[in-house]
Amino acid sequence: MINDIKKDAQDRMGKSIEALGRNLASIRTGRAHPSILDSVKVPAWGSEMPLNQVAAVSVEDARTLKIVAHDKNLSAAIEKAILTSDLGLNPSSAGTTIRVPMPALTEETRKGYTKQASAVAEDAKVAVRNVRRDALADLKKLTKDKEISEDEERRAADEIQKLTDKFVAEIDAAFKAKEKDLLAV
């Protein structure tokens, strides 16, 4: 029972870390990275498709992404989708290849993205703490129902707190790395 609660808490906290990683990856830095375009949807074959399903996105150099459409007829739609996205990117097309240069970040945009990253990290911490709260409530219920002793509850609560501290430290480390990346000129 206690192990099930701890395992569930660890799994849910791990999912919060994974979500944090995805959210931080979508925040643009000065460097080109294919995940920047993950949010771009392209009108293709009668529906909105994610860009990575209709084209191959690769890094050409440190500041340029190269996009090759799987279907050459989609090149114009891909270019338009990137232009109309709220990413502030300006693609240029050369036949079936689309190049997306990454504009240099101004000090103001760097600080804005750092604030955004901080908010994402704080949301992840809140999610981890909510998991801890749920796990502690489950332990209290087991104690109340006399399924475990108070000593076992206290021991398990300490282990869950250590788990929470470990995941919060991971979140802080991920944020610090992203912040360093954003503030590097």
UniProtKB/Swiss-Prot annotation:
It comes from Pseudomonas putida (strain W619). Keywords: Cytoplasm, Protein biosynthesis. GO terms for cellular component: cytosol. InterPro entries: Ribosome_recyc_fac, Ribosome_recyc_fac_dom, RRF_sf. CDD domains: RRF. This is Ribosome-recycling factor. Its main location: cytoplasm. GO terms for biological process: cytoplasmic translational termination. The gene is frr. It comes from the Bacteria. The lineage of its organism: Bacteria, Pseudomonadati, Pseudomonadota, Gammaproteobacteria, Pseudomonadales. It is found in: Cytoplasm. Belongs to the RRF family. Responsible for the release of ribosomes from messenger RNA at the termination of protein biosynthesis. May increase the efficiency of translation by recycling ribosomes from one round of translation to another. One of its GO terms (molecular function) is ribosomal large subunit binding. Pfam families: RRF (PF01765).
